[in-house]
Structures are given as structure tokens and as C-alpha cells.
Amino acid sequence: MTMQGNKLVNLGFGNFVVASRVVSIVDPDSSPMRRLREDARDQGRLIDVTQGRKTRSIIITDSNHVILSAIQTETMGQRFTQEDED
């Protein structure tokens, strides 16, 4: 999906992110990622798009926002790879 030249990637449940703004997609189970999530929550930079489901990936943007997604890290990586090929 594109929006005036910006490619959008589906994060699940009808939520999208501009692909060029994403810096990293990481697994949420490590201690550093838990700290990152808590710091982002405390600083108002956390966006939760899990709709109450378990967090399976964390997306970090160039604006330092942290997005929680219920989609597996590997699946998110594949979606970004597919967007790069289009």
C-alpha cells in the first residue's frame, strides 16, 4: 500500500506504519527490550497496536517512537522485505 510515494506496512488490525520511518523490528522478550518499552511508556513515546493481544514484535521508528505489535517479528520482517521489492 502506498500513500503519495510513502510505502505503508500493515502492523495488524488495520494499523499501518510508513516503511521508510522504521529503524528496527525486534523481539520483545529480552530484558533490554522490556526496559525500552517501559521507558517509552514513561516518556509518552509508546504506541500499542496489539488490541490486547500478546506483544510479539517491537518496531522502533526514526522519531524514537516504540510500536508494539501482535505480529511475529519474522512476519513483520517479511512484510517490510515485500514492500522493498514492490
UniProtKB/Swiss-Prot annotation:
Disulphide connectivity of cysteines: none
Alphabetized InterPro entries for the sequence: RemA-like (IPR007169)
Lineage: superkingdom: Bacteria
One Pfam family named in its UniProt record: RemA-like
Protein family according to the UniProt entry: Belongs to the RemA family.
Name of the protein described by the UniProt record: Putative regulatory protein DVU_0899
